[in-house]
């Protein structure tokens, strides 16, 4: 495994792989890797070579968000990537990705108006810009994203389609702790009491999933029950809890098409997300 931090080095290495006819998979991350990221890296090994990018992207953090506090441990991440069989790690400094005079961004108006885009207005502009740059730098055959960030996955797929990029975007299932909590780098912010309280997210998700499987199709009934579970926890504060069309990200009243049920919930000061999708017969 090789680790580099300049765009020039990545391009040269990948160019050499491509000359040999090798396929390349990219796993974009912000580091502080856990088993969720690990599942993406393992899936990406269906390619000849695996590139993992580690970059805490300042452009996707709002002015009051946790950029400086976001957990980082590059040495541990490198060891983990090597254990999982990654071939190349790209961990640039902010100045490498956004040099002086950088003034271009990629924005998407339609799919960013709901869910995380509503409470984090500039977030997806930052996501689209950095993902676009990484796809251009690495030029992978496939790129891998977790379904926990479901809205991000939909947006990246649309961006790749709209900009005629010949890259397959692969979504990978949510990986959970043994007690059900979706794995997230931000889980490390939780103290023991908050960690216990955070289980209301997965409890609500599992209840909602069960209701839909048993035939519930009215989203107001579904969301009311899911909200009641979260409201029982004093440390929990709902940012959003919505049912949206998986293609348009617009809210729906009836589950008569593929639907995403998504939530963002503050546990104390820590914002966590979770979701499930359902495709009716």
Swiss-Prot record:
This is Pantothenate synthetase. Homodimer. Catalyzes the condensation of pantoate with beta-alanine in an ATP-dependent reaction via a pantoyl-adenylate intermediate. It comes from the Bacteria. Belongs to the pantothenate synthetase family. It catalyses: (R)-pantoate + beta-alanine + ATP = (R)-pantothenate + AMP + diphosphate + H(+). It comes from Ruminiclostridium cellulolyticum (strain ATCC 35319 / DSM 5812 / JCM 6584 / H10) (Clostridium cellulolyticum). One of its GO terms (cellular component) is cytosol. The keyword Nucleotide-binding applies. Its main location: cytoplasm.
């Amino acid at each position: 495994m090789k680790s580099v931090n300049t765009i020039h080095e990545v391009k040269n290495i990948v160019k050499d792989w491509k000359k040999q006819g090798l396929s390349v998979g990219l796993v974009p991350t912000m580091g502080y890797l856990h088993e969720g990221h690990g599942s993406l890296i393992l899936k990406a090994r269906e390619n000849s070579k695996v590139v993992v990018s580690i970059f805490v992207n300042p452009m996707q953090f709002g002015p009051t968000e946790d950029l400086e506090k976001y957990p980082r441990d590059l040495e541990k991440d490198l060891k983990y990537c090597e254990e999982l069989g990654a071939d190349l790690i790209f961990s640039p400094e902010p100045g490498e990705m956004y040099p002086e005079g950088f003034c271009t961004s990629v924005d998407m108006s339609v799919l960013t108006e709901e869910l995380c885009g509503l409470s984090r207005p500039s977030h997806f502009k930052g996501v689209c810009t950095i993902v676009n740059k990484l796809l251009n730098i690495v030029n992978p055959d496939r790129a891998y994203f977790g379904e926990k960030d479901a809205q991000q996955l939909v947006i990246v797929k649309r961006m790749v389609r709209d900009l005629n990029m010949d890259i397959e975007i692969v979504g990978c299932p949510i990986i959970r702790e043994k007690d059900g909590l979706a794995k997230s780098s931000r889980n490390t912010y939780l103290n023991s009491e908050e960690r216990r309280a955070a289980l209301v997210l997965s409890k609500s998700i599992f209840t909602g999933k069960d209701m839909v499987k048993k035939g519930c199709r009215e989203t107001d009934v579904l969301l009311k029950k899911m909200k009641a579970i979260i409201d029982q926890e004093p440390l929990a504060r709902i940012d959003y809890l919505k049912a949206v069309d998986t293609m348009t990200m617009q809210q729906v009243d009836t589950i008569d098409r593929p639907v995403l049920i998504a939530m963002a919930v503050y546990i104390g000061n820590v914002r966590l997300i979770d979701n499930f999708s359902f495709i009716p017969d």
